[in-house]
UniProtKB/Swiss-Prot annotation:
It comes from Mus musculus. Residues 90-438 are extracellular. The lineage of its organism: Eukaryota, Metazoa, Chordata, Craniata, Vertebrata. Disulfide bonds join C118-C202, C180-C187, C296-C375, C318-C371, C322-C369, C331-C353, C333-C345. This is Acid-sensing ion channel 4. The gene is Asic4. It comes from the Eukaryota.
Length: 539
């Protein structure tokens, strides 16, 4: 007969709770043994930190007046450090700089600069033809020879060529130059190169950078000395004022390097007739700081293909290129002194469009033609002095020599003497007065003075913040699931062999057909099949 033994075990809810707690504690201890250690609390971190005063203010121990005073001292020191750090940062962000001057030792030979000169009068009156006067009427203010202001009927003037007009009607150096000497050697007009500027046809001495003339000594007599006749009788009469009308007499001079084009209408200085002008020069090599200390143009930016027509970048070349682009965009042509191969503007466009365009361009940092200074620049410092010429004796001599009267000599002749004061160059270099290394040094000193900290102390604090934050994130991500529990207990079904091994009471049932019945009540299974007998065992 098959026997099924069912043992119903019911636990009280009060008995189950301690067991669940014991199991939970065992699981927690097991997880703690297997998982990472819990992060240190603030008191433990403060007691081991290298930040001075933090352990006494926040470390383990009783709270009292002493700890409060330490906390106040720590906060005061921290506030003082932050104030000093902010002051240092503000000083660093102003990017202060200083200029260091270093006079170089005298050199046996120094390269002589380029000297550009222009007669202030642009057109010679005697060289102007009727067609020139007609085309240049708005530019010069001269009226056409026809009283009605128009050319004669049937007379056709050729189209004007501004380059030809300037080249033909400008003052010729061969006529102006009366004497020329360089370092004791004779020179002539062939040693000058023609260059066009806002003053028209001009001339540059020592213009070729590949064959620059050397100066072997300093002082007068070792540079360029020229005598010029400015030809005032060729100056245009003034009938009415225009933008090109000039009331001066003399020449404009600019001393510059060979790599820099002349920008003489703004950078030149005037030399008057009736005087001998002495220009003492000194070479100056300037080094400027790039961003963020200054606005100079670094070497890496100088080789851009935007300054076509010039071998090197310079402020003058940049300005001329910018002016050309503006005139070309508005007037669809360029002026004679501007680089390029575009069409030259006719005279009427000069006065109607080009001059107005140039006047509208700003030269400041906010204008469309802002040109930064190169970070490495060579310029020539000048000291100018003059004496009156000629004296009475030389006036009569020069009048006889050049077949002029003394009044003409006094009104037209001038002498220009350009020389090196000494064969030394002066180096001026901008240097950062407060750099990053100085800022870090000052911050480290203030940090050590007020809070006794260092870079490693900051790393300790960051490491502690990371440790605490990472532990909080892991707790959020790995929340344990709540186990399902029944409120009444549970029923466990055991097999016969398990029940016999675990039960303290012996079996009391008999097989089918036995004589004695079980001592347990309800020994007949109500759900058993007919003809079968089930016996219950209770423990």
């Amino acid at each position: 007969m098959p026997i099924e033994i069912v043992c119903k075990i019911k636990f009280a809810e009060e008995d189950a709770k301690p067991k669940e707690k014991e199991a939970g504690d065992e699981q927690s201890l097991l997880g703690a043994a297997q998982g990472p250690a819990a992060p240190r609390d603030l008191a433990t971190f403060a007691s081991t930190s290298t930040l001075h005063g933090l352990g006494r203010a926040c470390g383990p121990g009783p709270h009292g007046l002493r700890r409060t005073l330490w906390a106040l001292a720590l906060l005061t020191s921290l506030a003082a450090f932050l104030y000093q750090a902010a002051s240092l940062a503000r000083g660093y962000l102003t990017r202060p700089h200083l200029v260091a001057m270093d006079p170089a030792a005298p050199a046996p030979v120094a390269g002589f600069p380029a000297v550009t000169l222009c007669n202030i009068n642009r057109f010679r009156h005697s060289a102007l033809s009727d067609a020139d006067i007609f085309h240049l009427a708005n530019l010069t203010g001269l009226p056409p020879k026809d009283r009605d202001g128009h050319r004669a009927a049937g007379l056709r003037y050729p189209e004007p060529d501004m380059v030809d007009i300037l080249n033909r009607t400008g003052h010729q150096l061969a006529d102006m130059l009366k004497s020329c000497n360089f370092s004791g050697h004779h020179c002539s007009a062939s040693n000058f190169s023609v260059v066009y500027t806002r003053y028209g046809k001009c001339y540059t001495f020592n213009a070729d950078p590949q064959s620059s003339l050397p100066s072997r000594a300093g002082g007068m007599g070792s540079g360029l000395e020229i005598m010029l006749d400015i030809q005032q009788e060729e100056y245009l009469p003034i009938w009415r004022e225009t933008n090109e009308t000039s009331f001066e007499a003399g020449i404009r001079v600019q001393i510059h390097s060979q790599e820099e084009p002349p920008y003489i209408h703004q950078l030149g200085f005037g030399v008057s007739p009736g005087f001998q002008t002495f220009v003492s020069c000194q070479e100056q090599r300037l080094t400027y700081l790039p961003q963020p200390w200054g606005n100079c143009r670094a070497e890496s930016e100088l080789r851009e293909p935007e300054l076509q027509g010039y071998s090197a970048y310079s402020v003058s070349a940049c300005r001329l290129r910018c002016e050309k682009e503006a005139v070309l965009q508005r007037c669809h042509c360029r002026m004679v002194h501007m680089p390029g191969n575009e069409t030259i503007c006719p005279p009427n466009i000069y006065i109607e469009c080009a001059d107005h365009t140039l006047d509208s361009l700003g030269g400041g940092s906010e204008g469309p033609c802002f040109c930064p200074t190169p970070c490495n620049l060579t310029r020539y410092g000048k000291e100018i002095s003059m004496v009156k010429i000629p004296n009475r004796g030389s006036a009569r001599y020069l009048a006889r020599k050049y077949n002029r009267n003394e009044t003409y000599i006094r009104e037209n002749f001038l002498v220009l003497d350009v020389f090196f004061e000494a064969l030394t160059s002066e180096a001026m270099e901008q240097q950062a007065a407060y750099g990053l290394s100085a800022l870090l040094g000052d911050l480290g000193g203030q940090m050590g003075l007020f809070i006794g900290a260092s870079i490693l102390t900051l790393l300790e604090i960051l490491d502690y913040i990371y440790e605490v934050s990472w532990d909080r994130l892991k707790r959020v991500w790995r929340r344990p699931k709540t186990p399902l529990r029944t409120s009444t207990g549970g029923i466990s079904t055991l097999g016969l062999q398990e029940l016999k091994e675990q039960s303290p009471c012996p079996s009391r049932g008999r097989a089918e057909g036995g004589g004695a019945s079980s001592l347990l009540p309800n020994h007949h299974h109500p759900h058993g099949p007919p003809g079968s007998l089930f016996e219950d065992f209770a423990c």
